[in-house]
Swiss-Prot record:
It comes from Escherichia coli O45:K1 (strain S88 / ExPEC). This is Probable [Fe-S]-dependent transcriptional repressor. Keywords: DNA-binding, Iron, Iron-sulfur, Metal-binding, Repressor, Transcription, Transcription regulation. One of its GO terms (molecular function) is DNA binding. Gene3D superfamilies: Winged helix-like DNA-binding domain superfamily/Winged helix DNA-binding domain. Pfam families: FeoC (PF09012). Belongs to the FeoC family. May function as a transcriptional regulator that controls feoABC expression. The keyword Cytoplasm does not apply. Iron-sulfur cluster binds at residues 56, 61, 64, 70.
Length: 78
């Protein structure tokens, strides 16, 4: 089980990462990582970076049946 400090340190070392990458690297369940990232965000230590839907090269994101599931959400330190 990872700690809040380990999540922060990993973001410091890697720059920006997705929650799934952090979960896999630290061998911690993703819901726990999501909660830790939200805590870091509320403390002003981390920032959420979301891709814009206009970044889709094929233009098929708007009609995607998964509804923006292809858009990535990154996390980085402030």
């Amino acid at each position: 089980m990872a700690s809040l400090i380990q999540v922060r340190d990993l973001l410091a070392l890697r720059g920006r990462m997705e929650a799934a990458q952090i979960s896999q690297t630290l061998n911690t369940p993703q819901p726990m990582i999501n909660a830790m990232l939200k805590q870091l965000e509320s403390m002003g230590k981390a920032v959420r970076i979301q891709e814009e839907p206009d970044g889709c090269l094929s233009g098929s994101c708007k009609s995607c049946p998964e509804g923006k599931a292809c858009l990535h959400e990154w996390w980085a330190l402030r």
